Amino acid sequence: MALVTVQRSPSVAGSCSNSDGESEDDEGNSKGNDRSECFFAGKGTALVLALKDIPPLTQSERRLSTDSTRSSNSTQSNNSDIQLHLQSMFYLLQREDTLKMAVKLESQRSNRTRYLVIASRSCCRSGTSDRRRHRIMRHHSVKVGGSAGTKSSTSPAVPTQRQLSVEQTATEASSKCDKTADKENATAAGDNKNTSGMEESCLLGIDCNERTTIGLVVPILADTTIHLDGDGGFSVKVYEKTHIFKPVSVQAMWSALQTLHKVSKKARENNFYASGPSHDWLSSYERRIESDQSCLNEWNAMDALESRRPPSPDAIRNKPPEKEETESVIKMKLKAIMMSVDLDEVTSKYIRGRLEEILDMDLGEYKSFIDAEMLVILGQMDAPTKIFEHVYLGSEWNASNLEELQKNGVRHILNVTREIDNFFPGTFEYFNVRVYDDEKTNLLKYWDDTFRYITRAKAEGSKVLVHCKMGVSRSASVVIAYAMKAYQWEFQQALEHVKKRRSCIKPNKNFLNQLETYSGMLDAMKNKEKLQRSKSETNLKSTKDARLLPGSEPTPLIQALNQAKSKSTGEAGVTPDGEEEDGSRMHRRSIAQKSQRRMVRRSSSTSPKTQTAVVTKQQSQSMENLTPERSVAEEPKNMRFPGSNGENYSVTQNQVLHIQKHTPLSVRTRIHDLEAHRADQLPQQPVWTSLTKLITQTSHLGKSVSGSSSGNIDSRRDSSCSDVFSSQVDSVFAKDEGEKRQRRKTHSWTESLGPSGGIVLDPTPQQQKQQSNAILRPRGTRQRELPSRHASWGSGDNRCCLPQRTSSGSYYDSNRNTTAIFEGVIQDLKRSSNCNVIEGVAVAVEPIVGVGEGTVKRTKQKLEESTSLKKRCQEESQELLLEAVDAGQRRCPSLYRSASSAHSPRQRQPLRCNSEELMHTSDIENKNTTPGDHEATVVLRVQGQTLADDQRISGNVQILKQNFEAKAGVVGTGGGGGGGTAAGSGSSSTIATSVSAVAGACSANPGKKTTSHQSLPSSPVAQHANHVSAASNSNSSASNSSDSS
């Protein structure tokens, strides 16, 4: 390896001025042009030596060094031709380009020399000097122009002088800028890098024969890939084009790969791509490709070829030593012979004889091979098929027929084979899709590239030949794919069109499947373009798919604008179609919802399964029967926008839909309107309210007592409904929300009995005939009020509203039974306790209508008056009740139980009730006395468990019952002055009077032993009844003692 210095004029350090060759008289520039370049030269290799590695020398030393180098190079040129070749290469390069590397390559001809050269250019693409030059010129022009404007009135000769001065200043600034740019470029070239980081490189194929010419120009881009060939060479692939280079030595290959990887790395860093702003300076080299056709064929050679181009006429050929090479030569020669003769007049023997004469060898053993190859060539010799005006479909034969290609106006050739070479690479523009014709080939990924190639050729006014081996499978598939995308055809339509023009096509099964897939991809792209297409007038008038997609409802702002617009149209007296129907439909829906809210659904506790039961109708409705209210978002909303064609359109953020004037109602809307219409036609049905009352009726055995009770019941009922009842019921609602009351825990032993409910006590057989049936009277409807926000169950301001889950009372939680309960207050049943013997007790139900509601203020005052009475009677009633229980236990040692409870004691699950305590009839039977006894005493069980002080009474029904029973007991006690019998008071008796009767009987007969069950009263009503009965018992005992005395 030796150091070679080559004199180059113009030098690499030339300025980046225009290429018109402006002469510079500056001394520095002349010095810069007189520079040389140094290379490391080896056998077939020349590497540039960067100027930064050379120590700086003075001008005299540089001249001496250059002269000595020239003399030494002239003496060494006789021994090596590398310096001469480098010198000739410099004449081909531009003055701004740098020769990075040059390696010698192998050639098919012994007398041919080929070099692979890497040339680079430092491009000033930042535009810094141009912008600086423009800025300086503008600054000076404005500055001088301003000063000239101020002095223009003084002398007319001044503007001319100023104008000359401005031009002179601009020229000087331009020259200074050029000098600065030249210095920068010189420095960049000397450092072998660009200050802006933009260095572009390319591969040049140079042929050094009788004259030095350019045969190949390949830009080095970001997608450049380098692969080793495995045979002492390497391949470079750029923009789907592959070129093979084989250096003459291992050292040359090593030097070439090192330099090639360096420039490829810079291309990736700067992201150079094809058809980009980079490498525009290569056009000058492409215009200067002047090598011979044989040299061009060698530069564009491809690997793994089965069918190669014919050799050049001047190529020296020897007899092929092997059979494969012989067959290859036979193929090429056979084509030439068949093209030169008339196939209608000659035979196959004549063709074989001509072939033996040309090859000068006996081809007897290749007879079958020659016949088969002749048939193949005959199939390929058909003229190319014209599929479209700019697309021809042919075979290998058509691609090798130069005259035919030129006659058809073909300048672009699409080669869809791997085994066939490009026959005329310098004459036509080739695009290679190197695939085999088998079922594993993925041809689909190339169809977009082939479509762009054919489209570009059509735009340039050229025609394209698409060929493969026979023009049957691979090339036919490419043309079909192009037809589907270019003309938006379906797969079958494109296939039939191509087969109609060229009947011999037959793509393999794999290619057909890929074509069907490609058709689906094109359909998807069509829909995408249709969605992204601008909303033209035709789209606005389209009524297809004019439905709002989920999530495409109008925004709140559009809804507000729509409402404002509808209000404005309503005030103007213009009602759009369908709005009046919507208004009436909304009105009917609101009426139906109000009527549904009046239906109160209440849970209930039922009576046990006894012989007598209260049977009623269930007036509640389940939620399944209620029509759900449609949300506002489900209603169709449109932002009406009038169009120029008289139609209305809905304008949203993502779409514009046509609004039909008469849109048919949906099935859901029709069903909803029908249900609302039926709800309006339903008659007013009785609704259970909180004012329904429980009335207990009793009957006595004595005829005189029962006879006198017929008129008293009606009279007392009328009186209770007029004055006494209204005054006492008004005090029910006087409950303070913050007041804490005590309530005993109620347990009920009940069993479900359908929709019936109430308290049923088993009477004696003598009383069953006189027992009356329950009468159900519906109460008239009244306007309900909404509950107060801070109201608790039991206050007066929400007595008529629906129960809420979040209310402070326990109404909702306690109503979990499935049957209806008659909630209300117990009527005043027995006003006096004059009867000594009560034989039977029965309970019936009858609602009372026409009761006044009262106000909270009035009832509070009346409630305070009765509070003192309750507190005073509480302790006395408890003591009297305990005494009565002890006396009953002494009197009745044995109990008669029902058949169901006689066998074994049963543990009944206590069920909570929100109105009163219900007990099984087997526990309330008359079993405290002997069968022969005339006294029927019923004793309730008493339990000592109490709830917390802050436990409230749930519902206004309990409050009504408690207060009214308390008042009824007070009235009954006052009317019954001092007797133990209830003379003239009627046959009705409450549970409280029964307890008082028991207590009275026990006190009157202390010696008679009685046994009773102690039970907790069902509610504070029964508790207060205990107080009343105890007080009446004490009064009767005192009167008896006074009479006896």
Swiss-Prot record:
Subcellular compartments: Cytoplasm, Cytoskeleton
Biased composition (Basic residues): 586-601
Known outcome of mutating C468S: Abrogates phosphatase activity
Residues in Tyrosine-protein phosphatase domain copies: 383-524
Record's compositionally biased regions (Basic and acidic residues): 175-185, 529-547
Start-end of Polar residues biased regions: 1-20, 149-174, 560-569, 602-625, 764-774, 1008-1021
Cited Pfam families: DEK_C, DSPc, PH_SSH1-like_1st
Record's catalysed reaction(s): O-phospho-L-tyrosyl-[protein] + H2O = L-tyrosyl-[protein] + phosphate; O-phospho-L-seryl-[protein] + H2O = L-seryl-[protein] + phosphate; O-phospho-L-threonyl-[protein] + H2O = L-threonyl-[protein] + phosphate
Domain DEK-C positions: 324-379
InterPro entries registered for this protein in UniProt: DEK_C (IPR014876), Dual-sp_phosphatase_cat-dom (IPR000340), Phosphatase_SSH-like (IPR043587), Prot-tyrosine_phosphatase-like (IPR029021), SSH-N (IPR043588), Tyr_Pase_AS (IPR016130), Tyr_Pase_dom (IPR000387), TYR_PHOSPHATASE_DUAL_dom (IPR020422)
Region (Disordered): 1-35, 58-80, 143-194, 306-325, 529-631, 699-799, 1001-1045
Catalytic residues as annotated in Swiss-Prot or TrEMBL: C468 (phosphocysteine intermediate)
SUPFAM superfamilies: (Phosphotyrosine protein) phosphatases II (SSF52799), DEK C-terminal domain (SSF109715)
GO biological process: one example: regulation of actin polymerization or depolymerization
Annotated Low complexity bias: 66-80, 704-713, 721-732, 1029-1045
GO molecular function, one term: protein tyrosine phosphatase activity
One Gene Ontology cellular component annotation held by this UniProt entry: apical part of cell
Keywords per UniProt: Actin-binding, Cytoplasm, Cytoskeleton, Hydrolase, Phosphoprotein, Protein phosphatase
EC id: 3.1.3.16, 3.1.3.48
Function noted in UniProt: Protein phosphatase which regulates actin filament dynamics. Dephosphorylates and activates the actin binding/depolymerizing factor tsr/cofilin, which subsequently binds to actin filaments and stimulates their disassembly. Required for axon growth.
UniProt miscellaneous comment: Tyrosine phosphatase activity has not been demonstrated for this protein to date.
Recorded family membership: Belongs to the protein-tyrosine phosphatase family.
Protein known as: Protein phosphatase Slingshot
Native source species: Drosophila melanogaster
